[in-house]
């Protein structure tokens, strides 16, 4: 951030995460209390505070709290819920669900890129020194729903449920601010993404999905 302090950069987009909300029963907007339940989320909050604290008349940061990403990308991720379930449908011919009632806001990776472009092209007075949840209200899903969508999209993959290892993260997020300011509406859907991932796996393009390159925890001890 040294170059920022010298005034070389006017606008920075910071990729944060909706997991800063941790747990919450209500629809959570950008003003909702933060309740991180992982080191990953705590470090994101600390980084948000640092970069937003640098905002002034000459430097305008924008914090983007991203939903959980999904979909095919050149550097594929198989440690994200939709991608994991799609991959397991191919390798195990079943989907494993732990708990299932937890809410999670989802966002296609191409839609995420679209939001970055929109923020860079927007009037700085509109997006500077602002925090945005990035996603769409209609892609807030419970994990059970995600499994059902993917299982049906891939031809009736069976679902196995396990209540012994529950994920503490459970949050449903409002994206009204983003839609109102930038007119963002997602184009990607979970079922289309699952089919595209399966096609890539079947073609052999991705090789062995167990390769370390597909999992961030091999490179960073912070929880994803």
Task: Report the location of each language-model feature.
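Conserved Rossmann-fold NAD(P)-dependent oxidoreductase catalytic core, especially the SDR/UDP-sugar
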Residues: 1-39
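Conserved SDR Rossmann-fold cofactor-binding beta-strand/turn motif
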Residues: 16, 65-66, 70
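Active-site Tyr-X1-5-Lys
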Residues: 23, 35-65, 90-91
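Hydrophobic alpha-helix immediately C-terminal to the catalytic Tyr-X-X-X-Lys motif of short-chain
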Residues: 46, 50, 54, 85, ...
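C-terminal substrate-binding subdomain of Rossmann-fold SDR/epimerase-dehydratase oxidoreductases
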Residues: 93, 97-101, 105-224
């Amino acid at each position: 951030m040294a170059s920022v302090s010298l005034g070389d950069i006017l606008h920075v987009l910071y990729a944060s995460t909706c997991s800063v909300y941790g747990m919450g029963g209500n629809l959570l907007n950008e003003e909702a209390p933060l309740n991180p339940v992982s080191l990953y989320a705590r470090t994101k909050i600390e980084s948000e505070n640092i970069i937003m604290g640098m905002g002034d008349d000459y430097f305008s940061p924008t914090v983007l709290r991203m939903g959980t990403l999904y979909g095919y990308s050149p550097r594929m991720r198989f440690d994200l819920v939709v991608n994991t379930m799609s991959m397991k449908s191919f390798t195990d011919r079943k989907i494993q669900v732990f708990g299932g009632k937890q809410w999670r806001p989802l966002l296609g990776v191409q839609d995420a890129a679209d939001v970055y472009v929109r923020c860079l092209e927007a009037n700085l007075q509109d997006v500077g020194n602002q925090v945005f949840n990035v996603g769409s209200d209609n892609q807030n899903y419970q994990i059970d729903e995600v499994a059902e969508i993917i299982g049906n999209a891939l031809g009736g993959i069976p679902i196995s449920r396990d209540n012994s290892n529950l994920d503490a993260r459970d949050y449903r997020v409002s994206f009204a601010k983003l839609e109102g300011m930038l007119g963002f509406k997602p184009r990607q859907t979970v079922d289309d993404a699952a089919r595209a991932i399966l096609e890539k796996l079947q073609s052999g393009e991705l090789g062995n999905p167990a390769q370390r390159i597909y999992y961030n925890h091999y490179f960073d001890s912070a929880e994803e």
